[in-house]
Structure formats: structure tokens, C-alpha cells
Amino acid sequence: MPRPPRGRTPLRTIVSALALVVVALAPLQLGGAALAEAPAAGKQAIGQKSRPATKQHPPATATDLGPRVVVFDSSMPVADIEARAESIWSQQVNAEMSSERWSLLFKPGTYGTDADPLQIKVGYYTEVAGLGASPSDVVINGKVEVYNRCLTDGPTQPYCVALNNFWRSMSNMTINVNGTGQDGCRGSANFWAASQASALRRVDIRNGNLSLMDYCTEGPQYASGGFLANSRAGTIINGSQQQWLTRNSEVASWSNGVWNQVFAGTIGAPSEANFPTETYTTLDTTEVSREKPFLFIDGSGAWRVHVPDARTASRGPDWTVGADTGRDLPLSAFHVARPDQPARVLASALARGKHLLLTPGVYDVDRSLVIRRSDTVVLGMGQATLTAVGGSTPIVVEGKASGVVIAGVTIDAGTGLSRSLMHLEARRGHGHHRGHGSSTPTTTLNDVYFRVGGPHIGRTQTALVIDADDVLIDHIWVWRADHGIEGFTAGASGDTDRWRTNTGRVGVVVNGDRVRATGLFVEHFQTYNTVWNGEDGHVVLYQNELPYDPPSQADWTQPDGTLGWPGYKVGDRVLRHQLYGGGVYVFNRNDPSITTESGFEVPDRPGVRLHHVMTVNLEAGSIEHVVNDTGARVDSSAPGQPSFVVDYPAP
């Protein structure tokens, strides 16, 4: 079922204005990339050892990554590539709860021409990625796009939105935007009209606009993303995107904000000086970042995985400033997993010191995949999904491991109650541990998604438990499903059944110190969505919706009588914590009379600081305050109108 309209009043104004002017926006091309600096001593620039002096690439060594990995070569006719991509898109465009997973990979080369551009669309559970060492190694003259879906069961008709456009990605390529053959509106931008779990990474958008909404369909055209990192673009049209994080990128211009547009380490980011009139939150640098690992083909035709180093106080894309250093791992260092392999095979490979490359598909995991060795990489392709079986915790990272990277993986709760879906354990003994120096996180999570319910019944006590220190979260979505195909009937949209069956008490618990997050999205859990007990937490963009489905106020009241649970809770004993750009939304669909006391709850201490936070009503339910007892009430008398707190505590 569709998610409800969000922010209807302000978004309609924005959409109407954009529809009139956006096609007139002049395509803007950024200048050439800055010359890359030499890598620091002891560091290896990506592909350095094997890249030839010329830009020519020999044929890639044959690599079998399974039937759901499609590899394109620039010698293939554009029509053939489009036909194959279209057949996958037509299968996946409405397949929100399906088990199909796809990875579309492009070998180094140039695809499409000015007269005959390559134009493809991206559906659910589909990854589109270049196989070059640099985004400039794969050039698409054309488009890679996501459009609105026009839903026949929406609350109004027509109902064309991107609110449910989840679980897809594009990375590591250059797009020379070319709309030849499309109508005037469609030709005006490369559209990426997606919501959560739809990352854009390591892309270079040239010669045209990048639009994060689809303004070419009928209305209401809502979107609720989103994440862009390590990328470069000219004009970016935010449009109806309610919230968005842009990290370590370069932009020429940004059209507008809605509720919570956040920028960290981004060249050309808009100023936050007029907040909340302009809803921008801008940090000049990113405190700690580590880019997502990716597959590439080196100069000899060998397939490798590049694992980037961490950066501190960084700004701009690593590939434009000579900072794309790291390790290049051969595929022989990985266990290349298939969905039909039992969990014991994957666990055994980890125990033998192998990294894991999860090819596209859904994996049944009846025992924990335990990571004990430092520097282990678990990389998923095509939204690879691990489903908990028998109440398992699919991934556990032992406390002694450091430098671990888990990326591109979705973890589903199963029908048996899990204690957690991922557990990052604390180091045993006394003291703190980094193992690689102060800049390398103990574990990094890039594009890791958690799901409770949706395609099937799911149950977990907590989705993600972080007991380790020095963890880096870089774009995760932790989602207890507000809709699905489980067959629920009781309550609004089956919500009473959903509340009683798809149990997820807590979304994220952070007990470790110095845990950092760039892009933390947590939604619909039955008590706390996020509880942060560790010291020196640092969060850049937090997005939360409270659960839609409590049957009554009694179900949404704490034992001490407090009305509801805040969407973001900092532990009472915490001395130091920072949050930049946060939003908590309420849509109590099952009982619109439900009230929540506050969106954010934090201890009143000088070291605990929230910067640019808000609450908003989405037509049902109310929140009395934004932070503790500060900030105006939001309710259905003014749906879509946020209540902002610029700084808490006030300066």
C-alpha cells in the first residue's frame, strides 16, 4: 500500500512553481576535474599498480558472478543494452516486495552518442554501476533514471509519487545528460525520483540537470529521500524531496529545500544562514568519512574490489582531489557467495579469512555470520538480502576486529524473533580500541538497510545494536514496514494486525563511544526508534517517522505515563552528543487521536547539542514539543507545516 502524502501544502506550492520553470533551467557543465594529487606516502591510489598509461582497457577476464549480474561492454549496440535493461526494469518497476535482485555493470568505455544516447530506467532491487577505477572510465551519453510510480490505490487520484521508490542505486560513472528522443519535460534533466535506500555515489553528472523529483507526471509528485555522496553535478533540483543528505560532493547550484536538506563537506553547498526560511544545514567538512568499496576492472583486465581509506575533516569528492587511496583486493581474496549457499558455507569462509562478495539474491541465514578478523570486507551486489531464519542475528562483528567494512547489504527480520539483526560487539577488557589509528573506524556501514516486515512477517527486538566504539554509519535505513504483502486486515490498512505481528521494539541502540553517522534513517519502531547511550556521538542528518500503527494511545504510552516515545533519545547520563539536521514525523494512521510528548528527548547538558531539528504532522496524530519541552505542537490542524528549533539548548 502507498505511504501517505507528506507535507502536502508546502510541497504542492514547490511542485507547481517548479513545473513552470524547471524545463527552462539551462544545462550547466562543471569544468574539468582538478588534477589528482599524488597519494600520500604508504598509500595506493586506486588501480595504481596495474593501470596502463593509456585510457584503453583490454578485455576483462571472464568472471562468473551469477545469473543476476549483467555485464555490458561498450562494443554492444545501444539498442541491445536498452532492450536488456528495459526488460529488467519492466519486471522490477512495481516489484517492491519481490525476491528478485539485479546488478547491471558497465565495463570501462563510452556508451551512446549525441545522436543515439543510451537511456535506461532503474527499478526495485537494481544496482547500476561502472566498472572503472574512476567515474570517468565509464561514460554514458544519455540517462540513468528513476521516475514516479502512479499508484491506483493512492489516497487521491491521480497519485503519482516517488514515496515508495526504495532499494536501488547508481554509482561510479559519468552521465553526459542527453534527452534526445524524449519529450520536452523528460529531456530537461536526468531524473532520480527515489526515496530511502536509493544511494547515488561516485557519479559525475554533466551537461544537464540532476532532478531528485519527477515533475513530468501527474501529481502530487512527492519524494522522500535520500543520499548523494562522493559525486559531482551542476544544477540539482531538489523539488519535493522532503529531506536529503549530500556528503563530500561538488555542486554548482541547489534549487530549494523542503524540511531538512543537509550538506557535509560539499563544495558549492548553499548557506544555512537563513534557516528555517531556507531549510539548509551545512557543515564545511565531514568529520570522518569512508567511501563504499566497489568492483572495478584494472588495466590488465582483472576484477578487483577497491576498499577506500578513511578520511578526516574532508571536503569534496575523493576522486577529484587525489584522495581516493586504499586497498585493491583481488576477487580471489573473496568468497563469491550465491543465494543458494547455506549460511554455514559463508560463515566458514569468514572463519578462513576470506572476504565476502554477496552476489544478487536473497540468502536464508540460520546462524550468525561472525566477523572476527580485522579489515574484513562484506560487499553486497544488487541489494543482496540476508533473511534471519530461526531468530538468528545474521551479522555479528566481534569486538577484537577493526577496520571492518559492511556495504550494500539488506538484512530482513524473519518470522522467528531475533534479538537483533546486526550486533557490533564491544571489545572485551578495558580501554578503547581502534587498531588502525584514530582515522579508521572499527566498523563502517555503507548503504546497509534493515527491514522488519513488508515481503513477509518479521520480528526482532532491536534491529541494530552498536556496542563497539568508533563505528561509522554512512547511510543506513532501518525500517519497520508500514505496508507490505503479509495479508494483514484488522485496523487501518491492516495496522492492528501489523502492530501485533510485525514486532520491532527498538530500531537502533548505540552504546559505543565516538560513533558517527552520516545519513541515519530510522522508522516506525514500537518504542524508541533510536537510543544513543554512548559518549561523543556525532550525527549528520537524522530522519524518523513514528509508527503509523499503534491501535490506541494506551499502546503508545510509556509505563511511567509519558505519552509515546520520542523518535530520537539521547541517554540520560550522556555528557556529549551532537546532531545536525534532524526530523521526526508523525502519521498515526490507525488512531489519529494519538499524542506523542516530544520528537527528541535529550539530557539538558552543555555538551549535548542539537542543531536544526524539527517535527511535522502528516495528517494524523500530534507531537507536543520538538525537543523536551521546547518547540511548538504539530497536529492535523496544519499538516505539513514543521515546527523548528534552530539550536538546543539555545545559545
Model-derived regions, located:
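Extracellular/periplasmic carbohydrate-active domains that bind, remodel
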Residues: 21, 33-651
